[in-house]
Amino acid sequence: VTTNEKQGTRFDDNVFSQELVVTHPALWSPETPVLYQAVSKVYEGNTLKDEYVTSFGIRTIEVIPNKGFFLNGKRTPFKGVCNHHDLGPLGGAVNDAAIRHQIRILKDMGCNAIRTSHNMPAPELIRACDEMGIMVMAESFDEWKAMKVRNGYRHVFDEWAVKDLTNLIRHYRNNPSVVMWCIGNEVPEQWDGNKGPKMSYFLQEIC
C-alpha cells in the first residue's frame, strides 16, 4: 500500500518514528475485518539484520454523549457478552482453535463485541477478534485496593497496576478489534465518593 525509509547512524538513540499515508484505506469493522501488515526491516549497509511484521487495521472510534458509540462514523450498538477465559470445560490453557470456534458461535448468534472478563486477554483471542470481526473491551484487573476475594489483585495493586495497565495498552494498541479499555470489574471503591473517582481518574489517565 505504501512504503517509507529512514536512515540512522550508530550514534542515534535507536528510537525513531515514521509516518505513512494510506490513501483510500479499507476500514476495519465487524462486517469487514480488513487487516494490513506493517513490515519493519533493519539493515546494516545492504545486509538485512532484523525484520518484524505488525498486523493492524484502520478504523475510527468515537463516543458521543446521548448518541452512543460510533465506528467509522456509523452509530454501532454493542451486542456483546462477558467472555471468561476458561473456554468452558476445556480449562484456562489457551487453545486457539477453541477460541475461534467460540467466536464463530458468538457471531452466529448476532454478537459483535466481547468484554474480556475479568482478566487481560490472551494474544490469541485478540488476534482472532481482529481477523474474525469482534470488537473488544479489554479488561485490566478484577480488583483495586479494596478486598473482594482473599487472594485478589489488591495484594499487588500498588506495585503492578500501572505497569500492568500500561503493558496491556502498549501490547494491543495496534489491534483494531480493541475499541475500549476497562479499568476494573465491580470494584468496591466505586461506591466511595472520595476514593472511587480519584482512583478512576488516575487509571483513566494511563489509558
Predicted feature descriptions by range:
Residues 103-104, 113-207:
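Substrate-binding/catalytic cleft of secreted carbohydrate-active enzymes
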Residues 1-128, 132-136, 170, 179-180, ...:
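Secreted/periplasmic carbohydrate-active enzymes, especially glycoside hydrolases
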